[in-house]
Amino acid sequence: MSGYTVKPPTGDTNEQTQFIDYFNLFYSKRGQEQISISQQLGNYGTTFFSASRQSYWNTSRSDQQISFGLNVPFGDITTSLNYSYSNNIWQNDRDHLLAFTLNVPFSHWMRTDSQSAFRNSNASYSMSNDLKGGMTNLSGVYGTLLPDNNLNYSVQVGNTHGGNTSSGTSGYSSLNYRGAYGNTNVGYSRSGDSSQIYYGMSGGIIAHADGITFGQPLGDTMVLVKAPGADNVKIENQTGIHTDWRGYAILPFATEYRENRVALNANSLADNVELDETVVTVIPTHGAIARATFNAQIGGKVLMTLKYGNKSVPFGAIVTHGENKNGSIVAENGQVYLTGLPQSGQLQVSWGKDKNSNCIVEYKLPEVSPGTLLNQQTAICR
C-alpha cells in the first residue's frame, strides 16, 4: 500500500493552486492512495486485487480505479478472468470491463520429444464486455519458427459489436526475423475500411583491424567474436547469431565490468574444423568492444596409431605438426587424436631429450567421403 497527501502551507484547502494539471489546469493533483494484493492459490492459480484513488485541489471529485481477477492454469493451458472499474474526474460516465482470456500451446497435443516446426506456437482467444452491450472478440496464433526460434510470427482476427462502439472486424499479422546480419520485420493490419502495411530493417556494423562485420542493432557495450576458419558456427545463448563466412560475429550486448561467457556451439562446426576451446571469457569496460578470440584447427581429424620399431610409441609422448605447437598426447597402445591436419605432411613425436626418444612420421590421409567424421590409420615413426 502506498500514497501521499499534500497540504498548502496556510492550511486553506480552498487555496487556488498552480496550474500544472495535465487535463485541467485548475485541478492539480493533491493526494493518492493505492492498494494491491495478490495471493497464490496453491496449484489452482492466483488471484489479485488492486485499487487506487487520485484526489485534486478545488474539487471533491476524484479518479477511482478498481480491478480484480483470477488466473487459473489447466496443465500448460492458461486462463484468466478479470474485472476492472474506472471513474475519472473529467468523464461523466463510469467504465466497466469484464475480460476473459485463454491460451493453449500447440505442444499440448504433441509428444515431449516432438520436433514439429510448430512446437513453440500458441493459440489464443480473448473476450471483453463493457457491460453496456459492447463486446470484442479476438482470436489468433503466435509463436516462433526455425531451429533457433529467431522468426516470430503473429496472426490475429477480431470483431467488435454492440454498445457505444462502432461494429466491425479487424485483423493483424506480423513477421519479425532476427538474423546474424541484422533484423527485419513486416506486418499488415486492417480495421474497418482502413489498412496499413509496415516493414523495417535494422542492424549494426563494426569496422575493425580484420575488416567489417555486420550484426544485429548494437548496444553500448558489445563483443566481437573472432574465430577465423570457423564459419557459420552458432553462438550459444544468442538468438539468430552465428559467425559469418570469415568466422566473425557480433554479440550486440554485454555486461560491463563483469565476466561475459562467450561460447561457440561445437555441434555446428564443420566436419573439418576443431576448436582448441569452445568457451572464452571477456570483461569489457563501459562502451567497449571486447574481442573473444577462438583458435580453429582446420583440416583432417585422425585417430592415428603410431609404431616405433616393433613397439607402440610410448604413452605420454607429444605429437606436434605444423604451427600447432601445443601438441597432442599419445594414449595407450600408441593412439593419438589429431585435428587440423593437411592432406599430407610430417608429425614430430617426442617422449624424451635424447635422439632415440624422437622420431618423424610421414603421413598421407586417404580420400574420404564428406560425411566421414574421423579417419583411422596406422603410421610408422622413424
UniProtKB/Swiss-Prot annotation:
Null allele phenotype: Increased biofilm formation.
Top-level taxon of origin: Bacteria
GO biological process: pilus assembly
InterPro entries: Fimb_usher (IPR000015), FimD_plug_dom (IPR042186), PapC-like_C (IPR025949), PapC-like_C_sf (IPR043142)
Residues annotated as transmembrane: none
GO molecular function terms listed in the Swiss-Prot or TrEMBL record: fimbrial usher porin activity
Coiled-coil regions listed in the entry: none
CC per GO annotation: cell outer membrane
Annotated protein name in UniProt: Fimbrial usher domain-containing protein YdeT
